[in-house]
């Protein structure tokens, strides 16, 4: 198993410690206790970072205290993860953009947010190490095809906290368009099945962000589909 120590655990863990774990939920093991009898001599305490190791920006703890997040608006690591999620199979499903290629695009300053994928210089892409004209043509075709995706895929791709593929499908079929979702109130959102108040607030916060608004407008200009192909189940948003 791989254990993550980003949680604020009430356990004094030191580097090199042996711990007892148990299965918690479906995936993540839970650390129960440290086996002090096996602690290495001179073991050093583990300290959570106060700054991002990539961009150096301060980190903040989630409201629920479960994780630390980088506050750097232009953090390369965040951009890499955001782009990888945006193009993933459950999101916009853009084939041919693995993590190594995404990092190439970032290093070459060819992308600074997901909307830049729809304005790629494919001639320049073909000149990148390991690429070529065929790879560029295949990527261009995949990017163009993604413009026709259902709204649910775009909602998933945006990376709104707690809005995965399942919630994205419910939201898309309920509101019918991205514009309608952007204009939804807290009451509108919490009335949607499986959308609780925390998720609803995350959605409102996302759309209130100038950075998100800019991304959405750039996606609109690129003719990315903002409509759901599924029947709208709530006529209030038709």
Question: What spans do the regions from the language model cover?
Answer:
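Cys/His-rich short segments
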Residues: 26-94
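Short, small-residue-biased leader/transition segments that mark boundaries at the very start
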Residues: 2-9
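Short, surface-exposed secondary-structure edge patches
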Residues: 10-12, 234
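DNA strand-break repair and replication-stress modules
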Residues: 79, 86, 128-238
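Compact, charge-rich alpha-helical regulatory domains located at protein termini
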Residues: 95-100, 108-127, 187-191
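Short, well-ordered loop/turn sites that connect or cap secondary structure elements
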Residues: 12-13, 111
């Amino acid at each position: 198993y791989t254990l993550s120590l980003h949680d604020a655990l009430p356990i004094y863990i030191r580097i090199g410690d042996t711990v007892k774990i148990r299965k918690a939920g479906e995936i993540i093991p839970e650390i129960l206790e440290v086996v002090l009898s096996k602690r290495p001599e001179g073991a050093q305490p583990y300290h959570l970072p106060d700054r991002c190791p990539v961009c150096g920006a301060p980190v903040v703890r989630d409201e629920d205290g479960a994780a630390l997040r980088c506050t750097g608006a232009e953090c390369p690591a965040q951009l890499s993860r955001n782009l990888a999620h945006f193009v993933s199979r459950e999101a916009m499903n853009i084939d041919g953009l693995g993590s190594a290629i995404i990092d190439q695009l970032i290093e070459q300053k060819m992308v600074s947010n997901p909307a830049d994928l729809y304005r790629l210089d494919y001639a320049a892409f073909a000149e990148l190490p390991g690429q070529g004209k065929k790879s560029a043509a295949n990527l261009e075709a995949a990017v163009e095809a993604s413009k026709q995706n259902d709204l649910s895929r775009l909602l998933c791709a945006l990376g709104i906290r707690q809005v995965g593929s399942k919630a994205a499908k419910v939201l898309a079929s309920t509101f019918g368009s991205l514009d309608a979702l952007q204009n939804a109130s807290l009451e509108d959102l919490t009335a949607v099945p499986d959308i609780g108040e925390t998720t609803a607030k995350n959605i409102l916060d996302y759309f209130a962000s100038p950075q998100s608004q800019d991304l959405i407008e750039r996606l609109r200009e690129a003719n990315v589909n903002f409509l759901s192909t599924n029947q709208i189940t709530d006529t209030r948003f038709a």
